[in-house]
Amino acid sequence: MLRAAWRALSSVRVQAVTQAPVPALRARSSASLPSARCGLQTPSLLNAARAYAVQKPVQAKQDDEPASSTFIKEYKNIIPNMEKVDDVVKRILSLEMASRKEKLKIKREQLMNKIAENPEDYRTLEARIVALTVKIRNYEEHMQKHRKDKVHKRHLLMSIDQRKKFLRLLRQTNYDVFEKTCKELGVEYALPPLHFQRVHRRFLAKKALCIQVFQEVQKLKKQRMALKAAAAAAKKEKRERVPENPSNALPEKTKEN
């Protein structure tokens, strides 16, 4: 929509420039803008065009985000007396100038120190869950900026499914560590349904047809029962009108005569 509005604005400008007299444009060229020369209200048109723009949701800052002033672990161990180094060198060796990979590595180490008993063991289930959580949050930040990136979206969904699998295994083996991991990472684990059946179009159409047939059969049953009740009522009325023994009715007629 912004592109269409910008094209309409440029076409109106071109029409106004072609219709305006040449001397007047030359005289005003040094003193006014192109929008003022054409007599257009540029701010109003731009505001109308900006109204069509979709505002991207702002990603909330995470609590486990490391401070930008922290030093990278490798440089901190190599260089002695890090505090006495120049400020420019400190900034270069800090997370402010670090790559994305190094930031994710430090995030994972911080979470591992909170959760795992042995932070250096990356083969345990809780360590794998921490690594997948850091990766998922990185994918979510990327998807906030690039919504149409299908490759990262697929990797995000695959990582979420894998984390669900590891959480289920950890819940079955060590429930205390599972609770601690979910609490520290801020993850909510939902139990899967007992009976899962993938819904297809054919199944939905068949189910709708069965429901429709059942409703029609119930209607026919009600109509049949109503007809039977009406026939029974008519037969009862007929029996009440006609006497059972006609011989009992003859003496009454003779008495009346």
Curated annotation (Swiss-Prot):
A Pfam family: Ribosomal_S15
Transit peptide: 1-57
Ranges for region Disordered: 228-257
TM ranges: none
Classification via CDD domains: Ribosomal_S15p_S13e (cd00353)
Domain of life where this protein originates: Eukaryota
Cellular localisation: Mitochondrion matrix
InterPro entries, per the entry: Ribosomal_uS15, Ribosomal_uS15_bac-type, uS15_NS1_RNA-bd_sf, uS15_ribosomal
Molecular function terms, GO-annotated: structural constituent of ribosome
Compositional bias segments (type: Basic and acidic residues): 234-243
Gene3D superfamilies: S15/NS1, RNA-binding
Alphabetized UniProt keyword annotations: Mitochondrion, Ribonucleoprotein, Ribosomal protein, Transit peptide
BP-aspect Gene Ontology terms: translation
Cellular compartments per GO CC: mitochondrial matrix; mitochondrial ribosome; mitochondrial small ribosomal subunit; nucleolus; nucleoplasm
Assembly behavior: Component of the mitochondrial ribosome small subunit (28S) which comprises a 12S rRNA and about 30 distinct proteins. Interacts with METTL17.
PANTHER family, sorted: 28S RIBOSOMAL PROTEIN S15, MITOCHONDRIAL, SMALL RIBOSOMAL SUBUNIT PROTEIN US15M
Protein family membership: Belongs to the universal ribosomal protein uS15 family.
This protein's name: Small ribosomal subunit protein uS15m
Gene: Mrps15
